[in-house]
Amino acid sequence: AEVATLTNSALTLKGTTPTLTIGDAGAEDTKIVFDGNAQDYYIGLDDGTDDLLIGLGNAVGTTPAISIDENLAITTAGDITMGGTTPTLTIGDAGAEDAKIVFDGNALDMHVGLDDSADELVIGKGSALGTTAHIITDTNGIVRMPLQCSFGVRLNATVNNATGDNTRYTVPFDAAEWDVNSDFDLANNKFVAPVDGTYCFNAGIALAQVATNHTQIDAFFYDETDNWYQHNLDVGNVFNNSNNYYFTLSATIKMAAGVDVVAQVQVANGSKVIDVFGASYPFTWMTGFLVG
């Protein structure tokens, strides 16, 4: 073997195209080793993987910090710190393609990326942009959460003789205008919170056959624990000339996952003759969404 040792010297390659070649095309690792006092480092070609490695120690393939493969894909084995006065990480080269960061999890992958076809910043599930988007921001700063809990339901047909004699009546919403995650249980006429959070609810209830002897009306959202009272008055003095009365409810409620919410109405001091209007459009209705 031929060995050249330079002591207390520097090696300079000159010329128009100075080149230093490590290796002779043989099937072996080639490397440069930096022989330090406390730590050694190497830069080398790992012949087994055909990757260029920068690593700790003097043996190629052990404790690599950075590897570059034949497709120019770079893999780092440690943390990356960007310093300077204005540290910037740029993803993409202004090409007409998606650019993204993928978080490769154990059971679930997530991504943050620029969807080039829509010109939108997307945060979503999986590794492919445009599929299962959770948060979308467009060029105008409009933010959408297409999978956020949101619903609108209505009473499809009029229910006769629901209250009037102090019966506390749960409005049986049975048709959905929309329900993003199917969180409203139409079979049991109630909303079921999918996650812990704060929810906003609104409702409009239309009553018929109200009479002057119906002197009290109460209406509220009920969340299995509390009555969120919205309405209390002498309904027998405020109905219209068709003996109908329309009113709305609104409440923001902090709920645990699995808790139910229903809309209820109770009219007292008269006969049980009051109907709740229903229709093929939102006549008596309820909406809600997750605030956060």
Please describe what each predicted stretch is.
Residues V3, A65, H134, N188-K190, ...:
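Short basic coil micro-motifs at the edges of alpha-helical modules that engage polyanionic partners
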